[in-house]
Regions:
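Recognition helix of helix-turn-helix/homeodomain-like DNA-binding domains
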Residues: 27-44
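Residues in the recognition helix of alpha-helical DNA-binding motifs
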Residues: 10, 24, 35
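A short, Lys/Arg-rich alpha-helix, primarily the initiator
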Residues: 1-12, 50
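Residue-level "edge-of-site" marker
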Residues: 24, 45, 69
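Short basic helix-loop element that most often maps to the first helix and adjoining turn
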Residues: 7-20, 77
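DNA major-groove recognition helix of helix-turn-helix/homeodomain DNA-binding modules
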Residues: 26, 46-63
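Residue-level recognition of specific faces of alpha-helices
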Residues: 6, 31-34, 48, 72
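Helix-turn-helix/homeodomain-like alpha-helical modules used for DNA recognition
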Residues: 61-79
Length: 79
């Protein structure tokens, strides 16, 4: 699982606005903002959550750690 803080951090690493991520992930901006405002692991519909996670991973984000202990993100530059 991915935390709301990881989603925000990943977006910051990519220098994406919330609107950009919502468009790439094909979710509404309201949905994305709700997930980012959550404390810890957002309560999300699985389909939307997977879209957000996959959009970030496709852009080079790697989610590291686990949600309960030292969650983080890192950016892999594309070759």
């Amino acid at each position: 699982m991915v935390t709301s803080s990881q989603i925000k951090a990943a977006r910051a690493l990519l220098k994406w606005s919330a609107r950009e991520l919502a468009e790439v992930a094909q979710v509404s901006l309201v949905t994305l903002k709700r997930y980012e405002a959550a404390d810890g692991i957002p309560e999300a519909r699985l389909e939307q959550f997977i879209r957000i996670k996959q959009a970030l991973e496709a852009a080079g984000i790697e989610f590291i750690g686990n949600p309960l202990e030292s969650p983080g993100v890192r950016l892999h530059k594309k070759a």
